[in-house]
Swiss-Prot record:
SUPFAM superfamilies: Influenza virus matrix protein M1 (SSF48145). Its main location: virion. Residues 1-164 are annotated as: Membrane-binding. It is found in: Virion membrane; Host nucleus. It comes from Influenza A virus (strain A/Japan/305/1957 H2N2). A motif (Nuclear localization signal) lies at residues 101-105. Residues 165-252 are annotated as: RNP-binding. The gene is M. The keyword Cell membrane does not apply. GO terms for cellular component: host cell nucleus; membrane; virion membrane. This is Matrix protein 1. SMART domains: Flu_M1_C. Belongs to the influenza viruses Matrix protein M1 family. The keyword DNA damage does not apply.
Amino acid sequence: MSLLTEVETYVLSIVPSGPLKAEIAQRLEDVFAGKNTDLEALMEWLKTRPILSPLTKGILGFVFTLTVPSERGLQRRRFVQNALNGNGDPNNMDRAVKLYRKLKREITFHGAKEIALGYSAGALASCMGLIYNRMGAVTTEVAFGLVCATCEQIADSQHRSHRQMVTTTNPLIRHENRMVLASTTAKAMEQMAGSSEQAAEAMEVASQARQMVQAMRAIGTHPSSSAGLKDDLLENLQAYQKRMGVQMQRFK
């Protein structure tokens, strides 16, 4: 796996799924391929994106700044600086300075990532802030190692939280989660349908599922009543995709 592929993988792991994630993935690919060289426009676009947390925006802004060639005097962006200040916690800043001293002696991506993984996400973000504000300089490879370690820490905590939700025994949360997943699967079917011959069938199935979810939410149902809803919808989606010759990997 190339360095930039690895960076893209880690960064996208902390972006919530949805159309915005696809858009960000495209922007990252363009930046890494040298196709997008307007850092100012890129940062303005990033700043106004909804849904993303300030920290995720800060990390993306840091990656764009590292990758896109720009004039030396280009102004640093406040939204990135605020996100990478470690919540203003002096402990984070102390640890960030210690980490920075170690990273300065490092030259490889993997070496930097290994060192950085021993620190908290707050300290890692603060260290990124030091580099972003030009208070410290490391090689691009080392900076990318720091980015990936930060994303790994964040993704780990997101995964723990997600696992808690998936394994929860609370029937109301499970029921709502199944209905949300059914709705997003329906949306995926509608997006994939496009103008194909089977489009009408896919749209019909998706539309029925949405109506069912809306009805269940409006009248209230027993928490076990949604158990088969998502599975039925996924089965229909798989059958539809097989006929269309589309690979299932992306939807597993």
